[in-house]
Amino acid sequence: MYVDFLVPESTAQSILAVVEASLSPEGYQKALAAMRVNHFLGEVCKLPNILNKYSYNFLLFGTPSASATSPWGWLLYGHHLDISCFYKGTQVIMSPSFTGAEPNIIDEGEWKGTKILHKEGSLGWKLMQSLSHEQQQKAQIFKEMRDEGMKQVYGNSNNDETKRDELITDTWGPDDQRHRCGAFRDNRIVPYEGVQVSSFDSSQKELILSICQEFLLYHPTKARQLKLEQIKQHINETYFCWIGGFGEDDAFYFRIQSPVILVEFDHHSGVFLTNKEPAKYHTHTIVRTPNAGDYGQAIREGNEKLE
């Protein structure tokens, strides 16, 4: 919905009203923050036509209905914000989702003071700090953010499309960097890595749930509570892994993964900003539902499609 080029302001506001009605109040504010940070980046880089608060696409599928026989949904996607929302009766699926920020704070202008994705990172770091040395060693699958042991997209194929096997082997790419479940990775089979949460004490397990709750902020309150209960049921089947250092100033990546949820947090190198190495002010986060759970696929009937 590029307001200046594709739709009038009234249409943009109508789209935002659908998004606001679908998300939790705090989730809607998070989405707005991502849009505003994107707008701020456009101002900083002098690219307001392609980086602004409305530089997103909105797709509506099906006809909005409360009936389980008439599923529907919508997609909102663009730079640093992608949300999928699927409804079937009282069921709501809000994955996959992607939220990013470069930078992750606005320090001047209309939205000065806006911050995003700080809490997710702080909770992940707090969890890593709380682990025993042995647990930290198990969790830390690579010590460096760009480790020599990582297998790179196209690493051995010389860009030959017929030799691409990164869906199975890659652990680093120029776009997703350390993410395993980014764009074009729907239903990817990702091996469990790191330390098993069954070895955690009760306070550490609560931190896992707190992190997941923050990643699920877009969900309406009841849907989020139900999802957290589902995560609790599989808590001892959950794994936590970490890439990078875990000192106070270190950039890092972490993933929480179970049969019912997969969340990723990654500090990236600069794209529009100038940092060549990953830094804490460029952040990407992803939420996936494993086992064909994304886009409501697992609760659709047969070949049920939305148009």
What do the PLM-derived regions correspond to, one by one?
Residues 1-12, 16-307:
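A cross-kingdom marker for long, charged
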